[in-house]
A protein has these predicted regions:
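Extracellular beta-strand ligand-recognition surfaces/modules
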Residues: 70-96
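Extended low-complexity, serine/threonine- and proline-enriched intrinsically disordered segments
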Residues: 34-53, 102-107
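C-terminal motif of bacterial Sec signal peptides marking the signal peptidase cleavage site
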Residues: 15-18
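Extracellular carbohydrate recognition
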Residues: 93-105
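Bacterial N-terminal signal peptides that target proteins for export
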Residues: 1-7
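Compositionally biased low-complexity segments at domain edges in trafficked proteins
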Residues: 117-161
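Noncatalytic modules at the cell exterior or secretory-pathway interfaces
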Residues: 25-32, 78-88, 136-141, 145
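Extracellular carbohydrate recognition and processing domains
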Residues: 51-79, 124-126, 132
Length: 171
C-alpha cells in the first residue's frame, strides 16, 4: 500500500511538471479540427516575414490517419521558428473526396486564439485554382477530382500575420 501511494505521488508530480513545462514553451502550436476520411498527408508552409512566397524548405509534412470522425491534428513548430504567414495544403490522396475544416487553434506560451467555421476565412483564403469551398459546412474539395494537389489555404492579406504577432508579443 505504501509503495502504491508513493507511485501515485511520483506520477502526479511528473504530470504536473510536464504540464507546467509545456505551457512555457517557445513553440507555436497549431491544432486543426478536421474530418479527413482517407489516410493522407498535410503540408504546412511558413514564412518568417510577411512574404507569401512559400518554399518547400520552409514546410512540414504531417501524416494523417483517415477517420469519419473529427480529429485534432497538431503541428508544433520548433522553438526557433515563429511563422508570420502560413499556407495549408490538404493532402495528395486523390481518393480524398472532401475535407471538413471545423476550427484552427494557435497556441504560444500561455496565449491562444482560434478561428472556427467561417471565421477561418477571415484569416485564410482558398486557392481558387484548385479548391472548391462550402463555407457553411467547412467543406474543402479538389476543383478537379483527378488533380494530384489537394485543397489549399493561403493567408488572407496580413490578418493572420497580425494575429500571430499578437500571440508572440509579451503583453
Amino acid at each position: 500500500m505504501k509503495l502504491f501511494k508513493m507511485f501515485i505521488t511520483l506520477f502526479s508530480l511528473v504530470v504536473l511538471l510536464s504540464c507546467e513545462k509545456n505551457e512555457n514553451t517557445n513553440s507555436l502550436k497549431m491544432d486543426l479540427d478536421v474530418v479527413i476520411r482517407e489516410t493522407d498527408s498535410i503540408q504546412i508552409y511558413y514564412t518568417q516575414n510577411t512574404s507569401v512566397q512559400f518554399k518547400e524548405k520552409q514546410s512540414f509534412w504531417k501524416k494523417v490517419s483517415g477517420s469519419k470522425k473529427n480529429q485534432t491534428i497538431s503541428i508544433v513548430f520548433p522553438d526557433s521558428i515563429h511563422p508570420k504567414q502560413l499556407r495549408i495544403d490538404f493532402g495528395r490522396n486523390i481518393k480524398q473526396s472532401e475535407i471538413i475544416l471545423n476550427e484552427i487553434i494557435f497556441s504560444y506560451k500561455k496565449k491562444s486564439f482560434s478561428a472556427k467555421g467561417e471565421e477561418i476565412y477571415h484569416l485564410f483564403r482558398v486557392d481558387e485554382s484548385n479548391t472548391l469551398i462550402d463555407k457553411l459546412i467547412g467543406s474543402l474539395k479538389r476543383k478537379d477530382e483527378n488533380q494530384l494537389v489537394g485543397p489549399s489555404l493561403y493567408p488572407k492579406g496580413d490578418k493572420l500575420n497580425k494575429q500571430l504577432n499578437q500571440l508572440y508579443s509579451e503583453k
